[in-house]
Amino acid sequence: FFIKLILFFNFCDIMLYYNNSHEQNEVNQVKKKTLVPLITFLLGICLISLIVYKTDTHEKEQRHITAQLNVANYGERIKNEITNGIEITDTLKQILISEDGEIHQFETIAGNLMSDSIESVQLAPNGVVTDIYPANGNEAGKIDLIHDKDRGKISCYARDNHTIITQGPFKLKQGEYGIAVRNPVYLKDKNGHEYFWGFTIVILRVPDIFSDSISALSNFGYEYKISKTDAPWSDTYKVVYQSDGQINHPVSYTFTIGDENWEFEITPKSGWRNATLLIIIIGMFLTISLLLSVLTRVWLVAKEHKKKFQILARTDSLTNIYNRYGFDEFAEKMIQKNPKAHFVA
């Protein structure tokens, strides 16, 4: 009787321990089903952040490299386009030198030098504009450059420093803008002494003079700005022409014409960040991360259900006590653990 009683209490202790362990197991399983998918998702977010950061850095570097190449290439083209306009003044200068300060048939020569980007060609002996082509509508341009309030200082600088100067932009009568290029001319008298003859002048239309370059850049998706120093002695830049959009953190190219510095700046219209690519990457990897989290939870739930079915196969559904199959399995495990012990069932 005592042996049976001891066995009964031992069995009850075992079942109580089992029930407590089972309840604790269920709590742990609930935590596991929540935490593991959450950790999987958070790790996915960390991985996405790293991928996005690396991609963003690489894209910005590539866009900067491409922009640097474009700004240097088209900056040089703009310089050449402006220089081509300035060459008209050099042509007139050479004629004046060869003809000892005289130009015969000025209108014919100037007409042959004209192009769509040239507003007018002028001669200014002793700094006073006397000849303009085309003459019609440009009568007001016949002024004394040396003593003019707005043009005198920079014209004297060109004369005294033997350098080409550009002034502007200023508004033209047609509503467009122009830049005046003044090229000082020096001749020699009978004694071989050099003296100032005057200026050969060309008025360049803005933006016509560099329309090919800015049109190409606009098609490539860039905002742009062209600036020049306000005067040869100044460090202040004045905008010559710019696109309608905003210029943010531009790359730039500088060049010199005469004694004046020019600056050409560009920036992508869509910005330095490739937002479309980043959205695609975030969307794709976020979807993968969510799917992995869901699949992890599904796997954990399936695993838990499998364990529950295994428990149901071994225990009574009402009492949660081992049934015959479960008891036999449990007894077999106990015997295997303690092969030298004696058990009564």
Regions found by a protein language model. Name each.
Residues 310-329:
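Conserved nucleotide-binding and Mg2+-coordinating catalytic segments in signaling enzymes
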Residues 273-312:
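Cytoplasm-proximal transmembrane signaling helix
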Residues 40-101:
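Juxtamembrane extracytoplasmic/periplasmic/luminal helical "stalk" adjacent to the first N-terminal
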Residues 328-345:
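Active-site-proximal structural segments of metal-dependent nucleotidyl cyclase/transferase enzymes
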Residues 218, 228-289:
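Extracellular/periplasmic juxtamembrane segments that couple receptor/chemosensory ectodomains to their
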Residues 70, 81-146:
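Extracytoplasmic/periplasmic sensory segments of membrane signal-transduction proteins
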Residues 135-195:
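Extracytoplasmic/periplasmic ligand-binding sensor regions of membrane-associated signaling proteins
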Residues 30-43:
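N-terminal signal-anchor/signal peptide hydrophobic helix marking the start
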